[in-house]
Each structure stands twice: as C-alpha cells, then as structure tokens.
Amino acid sequence: VTEFYNRTRRSKSLPLALLQRWRLLEIGLYYLLRQSDLAREGLENSGSYRFADHIYRGVPSGAGALGRWLDSQLLALPAARSFRNRFLAARDELAGFLCRHSGEALDVLSVPCGIPRELVEGAALARRRGAHLQQVRFHGLDLDPEVPEKATVCAQAGDLDPFLVHQGDALSPASYPRPVDFVTSTGLAEFLNDQQLTELYSAIFAALRQGGTFVSSSMQRRGFSDYLLKIAELRVHYRDAEQIGRLAHSVGFREVATRHDSLRIQTILVAKK
C-alpha cells in the first residue's frame, strides 16, 4: 500500500472521534470550520498539496459569505502567514540561484512538487531581473497520482519549458532525476519522523550535483494552530533551526545556513553540497 506521509488522519469520522472523546464543543467548531475551503481541505485530506497551495495563493474562498470570511481569518493567522513565508523563501532562493547562473544549463527540482508555484514564480522573478533561462530544465517529483496533470498545467501557464514530472517516493533515491543543481522541498519535513527526514535529506543529497543547493523548511509550535491541527488529526513534527541544521550536516552537506521567517515560526534551511 502506498504511504502518503502527509495523510495522518486515522479516524474514519472526525465528528464521531470527537464525540467518543466527549469533545462536544469541538464538534460544533468542526462543522463551522468546514465552511472555509482551507479548513475543509485540511479536515478531509490532511496536509494535501491543495491545502498548501491555498495558503500560497492567499485568496479566501468558502461556502458563502461566512465561509469566505472564515477562510480569510484562517489565512490571516500567524501560522498561515508563516506557512506562506516558506513558499516565498523558496521562490526567492530559486530566483537568486537562477540569476547567479544565468544562461547556464541547469536542472531544478521541486519535491514533493504538488502545484509547483515556487518554481513558476521563482523563474518569473528571475526573468524580470534579466536572467536567461533557455537552458534550464524544471522537474517535479511527487507520489500523488493526481499531481502530474495539475502540476503540468501550472507549469505550462507559468512558462516553465521544459517541465518534467516524475512520480515516486521522495524518500527513495531511485525516484529522483539526476544530477540536479537546485532542489526545493517545503512542506513534507513536518510529516516525517527523524529517521524518515534523514532518508529524505540523504536522497536529495545524492541527487544533487557537487556544488548544488537545497532549500527546505521546518516549523515550530504555536498554540492555537496546533489545537486546530489536532482537531483535524494532522500530526506534525516540530523542529528548530539547530535540529535541521545538524541533520543536514549529518548527511554530508558542507555549507548549511538557517534563518527564521519574519514571524519566527518557520525555519528556512539553505544547504550546499
């Protein structure tokens, strides 16, 4: 059976699970939250690519005026704004990399790619700064069979040409195109235990060309957001900058830098092979 690391929900029915634990007020909150497209996606499909892309786009939507208002309030939470900051960090790191290597033959990978918005917007930002990307090949790797078609549509609309999709497990080195020059991986780490995260970092390290760059992230706990995640049975692993930096060094990365986003919830990792 294929294991989707971000699908952490175990209960067949969240309302029934809440009822069995006598969390009666949270049953009402559950049905209220479902009016928001963001919350409904999280409740139904855990940390899906659609959940992440909704935050990255930042456009409120939901069932009627109440749903849209509720969605806007959820998107305005510090945890959601910080979640979007990791996308912006990956976009900006990619744009800088493409500008520094303008005109070179490069391979750039997003894993798991979902909707590869950081590639699309990073490339667009680099072009606006004058970078020449004619020899850049963009890649997406994802385990979800729904992703290739949706990722390709996004890539084509964003003028990523060529964009090559690879379906496979991000923790398996055999899934990767290689060698690649730049890898972005945000959003998967928090669903992995330490051993699994080591496997992910190792697979990415093996796929990178010598001198290649890896951009990733981790997040820290915030009370209200953690409470909402628990209602949805979204089980995540929180890590600080020291932990992910040490792990990156342990798999062989020679240059490792970490920084906090402006809200100090997300930690951004930039590592070079």
Residue ranges and their predicted role:
Residues 184-188:
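A short beta-strand submotif of the Rossmann-like class I SAM-dependent methyltransferase core
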Residues 30-34, 182-183, 223-227:
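Short acidic (Asp/Glu) and glycine-rich catalytic loops that position anionic groups and cofactors
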Residues 2-25, 55, 65, 74-110, ...:
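Class I (Rossmann-like) S-adenosyl-L-methionine-dependent methyltransferase catalytic domain
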Residues 190-192:
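A short His-aromatic
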Residues 198-213:
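A short glycine-rich, Lys/Arg-flanked "PGG" loop and its adjoining helix->strand segment in the class I
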Residues 15-73:
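N-terminal, positively charged/glycine-rich alpha-helical extensions of SAM-dependent methyltransferases
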Residues 174-183:
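A short acidic, Gly/Pro-enriched loop at the edge of an enzyme's catalytic core
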